[in-house]
Amino acid sequence: MASQQMSTNNAQMSAQQAAVLQQTQAQQLSQQQDFDPVHRFKMLIPPLKDSLQNVMTIASLNFAHNTAIDNGLKTTEKGNDAAVQRFDKSLEEFYALCDQLELCLRLAHECLSQSIDSTKHSPNLVPTATKPDTVQTESLSYSQYLSMIKSQISCAKDIHNALLECSKKIAGKGQGACN
């Protein structure tokens, strides 16, 4: 009896732990997707379609209203104009969504450029502790990675010092050339 109760308690605890783990993973995935520009872009497409449809609907209603006024079927009374929706507000909403989409695309392009540059300048990866079962054949050890980073920092400092020296020579001579 006691062993059955312990096994059910253990099963309940493992089920609770699994549920908590799933919830944590879902939250992490959601947070990653919030910062992913491609995911954000995909999420903005349906509101953009709705906004465009709204702009076209309001434009057609305003066009029909103005045509009726031009043909003399309606008069330009204050109460009549209140029923017509504001085209400029709906167009502004559409442009705001377009601007957000543009920013998402620029951010995605910048992320891609950084990824390409990172791969070009540091093609070998450092193995991560999160995935011990996967073996990376072309990975660097941590000490190799540190030495590579130190050499990159040293190179950047050398370039910085050369530029400083050149600027001092130019400032000192007025119009001298750098060697």
From Swiss-Prot:
Listed GO biological process terms: eye photoreceptor cell development; regulation of transcription by RNA polymerase II
Any one Gene Ontology cellular component term annotated for this protein: mediator complex
MF GO annotations: transcription coregulator activity
Pfam family, one: Med29
Superkingdom field: Eukaryota
Family: Belongs to the Mediator complex subunit 29 family.
Official protein name in the record: Mediator of RNA polymerase II transcription subunit 29
